[in-house]
């Protein structure tokens, strides 16, 4: 295991809150990655998918509130003016951001847990608790999934980079697929971490990916497994841990991972309410942000890496729930070069 070097804890003034976040658990936030876009999507257990326009100076307007009725577990932008979402009612839906009109693309047999978008092919990729990964054409409605493949167990985490789909499952398997040839996986491997997978994310270059787990650990794995030298480059490390007042180590799930689009550094968010930004190349922690009120449920950098969306929602990790429950929030943090550039 590798140990990251510590950095100064920062309570920054350059943060502002998004008004009117989802009222119940925030399942995902995502900045649109279109060049020049300022849009941010958020899904929640209150059954809403919300789209905001986020200005550079903290000015925010709400462009869309799509009320689904059932808890939403995921969302993703699907092109310039569309957002897709899914949840516990098994359905995959698509909404037009300008008009607010929505349509159902199809469904899974169980809850839709993950969704991502491939702009190169205009395909929405969904992963469900029914152990399936499905592809949907964002340009045509009502034709159902254009392709589907079964994995070993429920999909818990997913990422898409160009045509490659990365899937983490309940049974701790990691699958990689080419969306143009979905029938057979490019790779199947065991997770390098011993406990349940919470997030998977590709490096922006696609040469490697990150896996996080419920046991306060993160692993860096390389796609190319050929040769002893490549195997030496992979590593894992402990994070999101703290000492209790009696000296007991508290280990927190690492719920979310997000990569900086310019520098290839990445942020992690945990049940300890902490956001860390890491340098995976030099194996150092660049910065630790101040402690938030409750668990970090989702993170997303904007298209140029100058802003980080931080969603906080209590995830019911504690044996005794706090009363009252902490408020949900979405914070936009301005990210500077020294906070995100490799050391």
Curated annotation (Swiss-Prot):
InterPro entries referenced in this protein's UniProt entry, alphabetically: G-protein_beta_WD-40_rep, WD40/YVTN_repeat-like_dom_sf, WD40_repeat_CS, WD40_repeat_dom_sf, WD40_rpt
Repeat region (WD), residues: 21-62, 67-105, 107-146, 150-187, 192-232, 249-288, 291-331
GO CC entries: bub1-bub3 complex; kinetochore; mitotic checkpoint complex; nucleoplasm
Recorded phenotype for the gene knockout or disruption: Viable, but with a reduced brood size. Reduced bub-1 expression and localization at the kinetochore which may lead to the delay in the onset of anaphase during embryogenesis. Defective synapsis with increased numbers of nuclei that contain asymmetrically aligned (clustered) chromosomes. RNAi-mediated knockdown results in reduced survival as compared to wild-type animals in anoxic conditions.
Pfam families: WD40 (PF00400)
Keyword Cell division (UniProt): yes
Gene Ontology molecular function, alphabetical: ubiquitin binding
Sorted UniProt keywords: Cell cycle, Cell division, Centromere, Chromosome, Kinetochore, Meiosis, Mitosis, Nucleus, Repeat, WD repeat
Gene3D superfamilies per the UniProt record, alphabetical: YVTN repeat-like/Quinoprotein amine dehydrogenase
Biological process, per Gene Ontology: Bub1-Bub3 complex localization to kinetochore; cell division; embryo development ending in birth or egg hatching; meiotic spindle assembly checkpoint signaling; mitotic spindle assembly checkpoint signaling; regulation of cell cycle
Region (Disordered): 322-343
Localization (cell): Chromosome, Centromere, Kinetochore; Nucleus
Major localisation: nucleus
Basic and acidic residues bias locations: 334-343
Domain of life of the source: Eukaryota
Complex formation: May interact with bub-1; for localization at the kinetochore and the onset of anaphase.
Family of this protein: Belongs to the WD repeat BUB3 family.
Purpose of the protein: Has a dual function in spindle-assembly checkpoint signaling and in promoting the establishment of correct kinetochore-microtubule (K-MT) attachments. Promotes the formation of stable end-on bipolar attachments of chromosomes. Necessary for expression and kinetochore localization of bub-1. Plays a role in synapsis checkpoint signaling inducing apoptosis in response to unsynapsed chromosomes and thus controlling chromosomal segregation during oocyte meiosis.
Protein's recorded name: Mitotic checkpoint protein bub-3
Lineage: Eukaryota, Metazoa, Ecdysozoa, Nematoda, Chromadorea
The encoding gene: bub-3
């Amino acid at each position: 295991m590798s140990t990251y070097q510590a950095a100064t804890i920062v309570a920054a003034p350059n943060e502002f809150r998004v008004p009117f976040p989802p009222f119940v658990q925030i399942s995902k936030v995502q900045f649109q990655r279109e060049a020049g876009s300022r849009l941010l999507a958020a899904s929640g257990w209150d059954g809403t998918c919300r789209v905001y326009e986020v200005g550079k100076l903290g000015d925010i307007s709400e462009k869309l509130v799509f009320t689904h009725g059932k808890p939403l577990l995921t969302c993703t932008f699907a092109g310039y003016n569309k957002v897709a979402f899914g949840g516990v009612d098994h359905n995959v839906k698509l909404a037009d951001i300008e008009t607010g009109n929505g349509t159902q693309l199809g469904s899974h047999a169980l809850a839709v847990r993950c969704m991502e978008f491939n702009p190169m092919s205009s395909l929405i990729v969904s992963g469900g608790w029914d152990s399936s990964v499905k592809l949907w054409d964002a340009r045509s409605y009502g034709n159902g999934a254009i392709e589907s493949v079964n994995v070993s167990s429920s999909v818990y985490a997913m990422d898409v980079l160009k045509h490659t789909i990365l899937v983490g499952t309940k049974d701790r398997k990691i699958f990689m697929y080419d969306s143009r040839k979905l029938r057979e996986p490019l790779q199947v491997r065991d997770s390098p971490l011993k406990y349940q997978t919470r997030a998977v994310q590709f490096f922006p270059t696609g040469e490697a990916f990150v896996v996080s787990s419920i046991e306060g650990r993160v692993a860096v794995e390389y796609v190319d497994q050929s040769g002893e030298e490549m195997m030496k480059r992979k590593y894992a490390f402990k994070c999101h841990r703290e000492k209790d007042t009696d000296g007991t180590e508290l280990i927190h799930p690492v719920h979310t991972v997000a990569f900086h689009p310019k520098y290839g550094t990445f942020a992690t968010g945990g049940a300890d309410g902490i956001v860390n930004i890491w340098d995976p190349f030099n194996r150092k922690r660049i910065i630790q942000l101040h402690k938030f009120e409750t668990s970090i449920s989702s993170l997303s950098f904007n298209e140029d890496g100058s802003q980080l969306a931080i969603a906080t929602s209590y995830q019911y990790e504690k044996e005794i729930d706090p009363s009252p429950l902490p408020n949900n929030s979405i914070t936009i943090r301005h990210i500077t070069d020294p906070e995100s550039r490799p050391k």
